[in-house]
Regions:
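Histidine- and aromatic-enriched segments that form or immediately flank copper-ligand environments
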Residues: 1-72, 110, 114, 118-121, ...
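Small/polar beta-strand repeat architecture
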Residues: 72-104, 108-158
Length: 179
């Protein structure tokens, strides 16, 4: 059996609920699993695989700097795409770090049944040579997208996909979140 979960967050960083440090993750209970990070972020010797809000495009600024963590790596599509397209044009959220070659990003992350996760093959202009002043980039993927996407849809790294292949069931299997 396989449990396949795609976890995203809409919880913005703010001073009222989480003191500018929103990071969400989940982990399972009551089945045998690998504790080396494939089954959750806080079980065993695991690196932090939590995500932040894909809806957040701004942060409170103080003296020219963001308060708390930087703006999440979120962007919006500038032009609509068709199924099979291998390139997208985006505008990164201001004050966020641009995506990088080799990263996997999700196009249309807010669309219930129309998301595309793809690896970045190239980015123009190259953010390693300086960030684009207008925050706009053209991204080429390693393969075409399955779905069409409308201009304005969100492109983000802020997701985690969990796939749990359960070896042993030890009772009521469940998972819960941490924020």
């Amino acid at each position: 059996d396989c449990v396949d979960v795609l976890l995203t967050s809409e919880w913005d960083d703010d001073d009222f609920t989480n003191f500018q440090m929103s990071k969400v993750n989940i982990h399972p209970h009551f089945f045998q699993f690998d504790n080396q990070a494939s089954d959750g972020v806080i079980s065993g010797f695991s690196y932090d695989q939590s995500m932040r809000s894909y809806l957040q495009f701004d942060k409170k600024m103080k003296d020219g700097h963001h308060v708390g963590m930087p703006v999440p790596m979120n962007a919006k599509l500038l032009k609509s795409t068709k199924s099979g397209d291998k390139t997208v044009e985006i505008e990164m959220a201001h004050h966020s770090t641009p995506f990088h070659v080799g990263a996997d990003i999700m196009v249309g992350i807010e669309v219930p049944n129309g998301k595309d996760a793809r690896w970045i093959k190239s980015i123009t202009p190259d953010p390693n040579k300086g960030f684009a002043k207008d925050h706009k980039y053209k991204i080429t993927f390693t393969e075409g997208m399955t779905h069409a996407h409308k201009a304005g849809q969100i492109v983000s790294t802020e997701y985690v996909r969990y796939r749990w292949w359960v070896d042993v069931d030890l009772g009521l299997v469940f998972w819960h979140d941490h924020a």
